[in-house]
Amino acid sequence: MSQLRPRDSSAGKSSSPRRTDRNPESIDVNSKGGSEGMTSGLVPGTAPHKEDETEAEDDIDCGRLITSKSLATMLTTASMYAGVSQLDDDAIESSALDEPIPYVPYEEDAESVMSESTVGVDTVRDTDSSEQINPEIDGLVALRKKQQHTLSKFELSVVRKRCSQLSLAGSSSGSTRRNSFTLDNNETTRAVKLCEKLKTTFDLSDDDEFVNDYPCWLLHEVFLQGHIYITSRYLLYFAFLPKRDSTVTMSGALSIRSSTTMRFSVRRWAVLKGNYFRLYANSTERYFPSLNIDLRFLLKVELSNPNLEENKPTVFKLITEARTHYFQADSLDNARSWVTDLRKHIFTAKNSGGHVTIKVPLENILDLSIETLFEASQTLKLKVLESEESYAIDDYYFMFFNNGDQVLDSIRQSMKALGIELTDSDSSESDSDVSGSETNGRSTHRKSKLSRSLSVLTPIPRGIGSIYKPIKSSASGIIGAIKKPQKSATRPFSSVVETVVPNDNDSELKQDHAGDAPKDSEEPSTKPSNWSAKSLVQGFLSTTSSISQSMLFASPMHYNNQLFIERGEEDPYFVTNKEEREVAQSRFRKHFSLPDSEELLASYFCHFQKNIPVYGKVYLGTTCICYRSLFPGTNTTMILPYSDIENVYNLKGFRFGYSGLVIVIRAHEELFFEFGSNESRDDCDLFLLKQLDFTKSHKNAHSEQKRKRNDSIKLAESVQLADARLRYFETRIESDIGREVPIILEENQYSTSEIRSKRRYKFVLLTIGSRGDVQPYISLAKGLLAENHKVKIVTHEEFKPWVESYGIEFATIAGNPAELMSLMVTHKSLSVGFLKEAKEKFTGWIGELLQSSWDACQDADVLIESPSAMAGIHIAEKLQIPYFRAFTMPWTRTRAYPHAFVVPEQKRGGSYNYLTHIIFENVFWKGISGEVNKWREQVLMLPKTNLERLEQNKVPFLYNVSPTVFPPSMDFPHWVKVVGYWFLDEGEADSYDPPKPLLEFMEKAKTDGKKLVYIGFGSIVVSDPKQLTEAVIDAVLSADVRCILNKGWSDRLGKQTGVEVELPEEIYNSGNVPHDWLFGKIDASVHHGGSGTTGATLRAGIPTIIKPFFGDQFFYANRVEDIGVGIGLRKLNSKSLSKAIKEVTTNTRIIEKAKEIGKQIQSENGVSAAIRCLYQEMEYAKKLSKSKQKYWDNQSEDISDDSVSGSWFEV
């Protein structure tokens, strides 16, 4: 894959890539698809060289320089050019959806690109190369004759331009690989297809002529990567938009402002996906949004106060036609992230065609100017007459990092050929419109009279709030902020709304949908009225009751009769009036914020059975069934995809005379609906089953293709990671200029732009504990290595060979994991006895751990630590580097879960859960504070600290657990993420060779028809291994199953006296077997409940039995019971284990639920999600570390409240 490289200032020489390891703003942008990255049919844009700023990002005084260079560097290298090939690919997309286009592209390497750009040779004119291209024109003519098509003037101009560029590229690079004057058949065909696509997209005539094309960025409320095409009559702009309808771009908890108290007292889970923004009651809810906003009709999104402190809660607002919604994020950075992503989605939603096209007749251009807004960029400003009738003038801004002057010259020459006279001036009067600071540039003004109006095929919508305000104001706001980063630009809001939504006539009983606001207060009537509360309520109830009864027993309404046509029957419920059907379709999409492709098939009035029957209406669409309540005071909305429905069946209603319908949902409780008649219920059942059959057949047809496509996606190429990298650079720019800068890169099926940081961060992963604590970090390290970063794992010496076998750097810290585990198993949870023994055995070890951790982590750029390691937060404070925590058990204050070391026997509510975290934090800090503060003063040269100043609850936290098992709590702040398991697959077919006796044992169990169960408690230390082994043997024989046994408990610090227990033939002693290889081949698993083992079991989709010994194992024993996939054993003996094994191997409900949970976990990529969060929260983490140093700099005395030496015993 070719890589864009900076060019040297000396002409005629191509430069080698410069080392930019210490510059986080430097990026690579690669093009995927086509050939080696440069799939363009025309001149590729190359990045102008920028001197490296090695340490500038850490210098506060260089903020403005950093802002300019970071934005310039990023957008420059992102201006790769794939537009022509994309247009070509898109032209034949309909005929080749499943396979890439068989295309052998122009073999142009990076050196040829660099040479052409360095010498700065302008494009050769058609007349200069006519002799060279005649053979190619003859070949094209022959091709067209064969296709029975006459060669047009426009096609000739495209081929001539292509030959000229090949000639220039070959001469400047000195390449001898091909004749630079020759086009092969593939390129000739490609040029013809390009002509057809341009003519179709922009409605060009055959008499038009192609002049040139250039990569550029459209400056609007977003920075949109695209391409300008210049013809003899038009200036054309084209950009593909990313298609992310099925991907959740952003999610997290937000506070909502109450309309009555005006306080942000309610937390909801927000999801931004495709064209909608929805709020749910919690992170596990998927079908019942409490708020549903269609982004196509959103007018504006902005921060309410962008000048707040960094880590203070920040309010942003969404303005719709009906009301303004206020949301509070946990910090300014988080609010900016929401605003930036919302603006991108709004822009994409309002340009639903998948691309943005602008067509400007050259005759309508009133003014041209090139302005240098900041270093290494040129901005082309166009003043264009919109129409002769309105005489409105539009401003368009296009940013170039190369060839800006050439673009201006090309436009001038084309206009001159049309007889439009131009004059030059040193600077345009409108230069100051873009920025308050001085700009250098040249301007061209019209003298001739206009003769035709501007034509825009797919224009940027105008007049829709600040998102789609006139481009002049949006561009000036962004660029003005770049020029003056210390000042916050104010953005005007236009109240003009172009979108008109029809009224809904079937919602007399309530307001529209969750996204709408209450009606404005009416003015009080001047007429006297005689009424009482009793009469008013009686009248209201009687009216609504009569309406409800009449609507409930109304007949179904069909809006598509294809089902009855296929059956050869007449549809008695079909709405024959076309206008009524169109209005109903519009209402349906509006209510549930559905795309235009969603079609309403039928609708029914019914009751939805929740706590009480809720009257409403069911809608059957092409891909989902929807419901909305119609009774006053209720606000229930449901959007349920057919793909999540397992079955539908009929039953009697709960009330006399009603007919019931049950919808069975995968991994969710059943839904009950009551209809007023059997006819309506049966009709709904018929339509539902038909759509389910269609959905399943369609899904099966594409499942194999989807699987192959997913298998080919690498970690570094995932959409989520690409978005995270882009968001990281956006965050840096926003932090510098104090304004949101949404950047949209082009993307289509065959070619996408990818941003990568050129700086290789040194990630240090610090952890202590057992093998299960180290294994996830190896998986994360592999992902970071794939991202081209450097990684070092710091842990106990015994894991060194294992870690280094993956090519990961290793460093040692103090401590014996077996002794730590023995302490934990002995005391199980936090207690006085635990503290006493810890004081006796580990007081000296804490000092050794802190010192060895500091020695191993001093070269870190980013530090990720298990909080049990204790040293990381202090090391990050000293080094002023981003610091993250990662763990497998609850460690963050929340009301949803107790602390993993203080899990009660039974659930005791949110207040108790929150209290367990407070208690543990204080006890844990009291136990280590003495050693820690001594180490801080003597080694780190930092002042003493206390629990408050540590600000542990503000540290970005990554939970490497599946959100299916550990759903994010609503009171988690935005920097606490549940990313998914970090699996380390060691048992793949090419890396693990199972012993033959194990395979024979498994095959015999299958032949005998016996369930196969795995039993192993990892590296747990137990006091009496023999007794535990005997209990396992008795339980296996009693349950009549076959067992694969891993007796790890007898190998570590156990009593080695006595004779080893002999195992019966029903049990095979396997030792360590890779879980990813084994668990997919058995029926159930019994283990200790470690996070890694639990995750591997659940991913395999098999039931699990957990016997917890200490720590988070009690937590996961409760979780597997809560989600219905297994059993937690508080006490293990032969009887209890036998009963549990029988239950999980025979209970169909547990088995099916485990399979469903397994599918969900298999669809997750925890490592990819973790790296995405690292990018997203990197800037926040760095600010947090630096803020502590600023605090100490402002303190004149030690604030530590630890007057006595803290220890493990003094609490």
Curated annotation (Swiss-Prot):
Entry's family note: Belongs to the glycosyltransferase 28 family.
Group of enzyme by EC: transferase
Basic and acidic residues bias spans: 1-10, 507-525
GO cellular component, one term: phagophore assembly site membrane
InterPro entries assigned to the protein according to its UniProt record, in alphabetical order: ATG26_PH_GRAM1, ATG26_PH_GRAM2, EryCIII-like_C, Glycosyltransferase_28, GlycoTrans_28_N, GRAM, PH-like_dom_sf, PH_domain
Coiled coil: none
Name of the gene: ATG26
Its biological purpose: Sterol glycosyltransferase responsible for the glycosylation of ergosterol to form ergosterol-glucoside. Shows also activity in vitro on other sterols such as cholesterol, beta-sitosterol, stigmasterol and tomatidine. Probable sterol 3-beta-glucosyltransferase that mediates autophagic degradation of peroxisomes (pexophagy).
PROSITE patterns: PH_DOMAIN (PS50003)
GO process terms (BP): autophagy; carbohydrate metabolic process; lipid glycosylation; protein transport; sterol biosynthetic process
Membrane topology summary: Peripheral membrane protein
Subcellular location(s) per record: Cytoplasm; Preautophagosomal structure membrane
Domain spans labelled PH: 248-347
Disordered, as annotated region: 1-61, 422-452, 500-531
Name of protein: Sterol 3-beta-glucosyltransferase
EC number(s) given by UniProt: 2.4.1.-, 2.4.1.173
UniProt biased composition (Acidic residues): 423-432
Binding locations of UDP-alpha-D-glucose: S770, R771, D773, N1046, N1072, V1073, H1075, H1088, S1091, G1092, T1093, D1112, Q1113
Record's comment describing the protein's domains: The first GRAM domain is required for association with the micropexophagic apparatus.
One Gene Ontology molecular-function label: sterol 3-beta-glucosyltransferase activity
Recorded catalytic activity of this chain's protein: a sterol + UDP-alpha-D-glucose = a sterol 3-beta-D-glucoside + UDP + H(+); ergosterol + UDP-alpha-D-glucose = ergosteryl 3-beta-D-glucoside + UDP + H(+)
The keyword Transmembrane is annotated on this UniProt entry: no
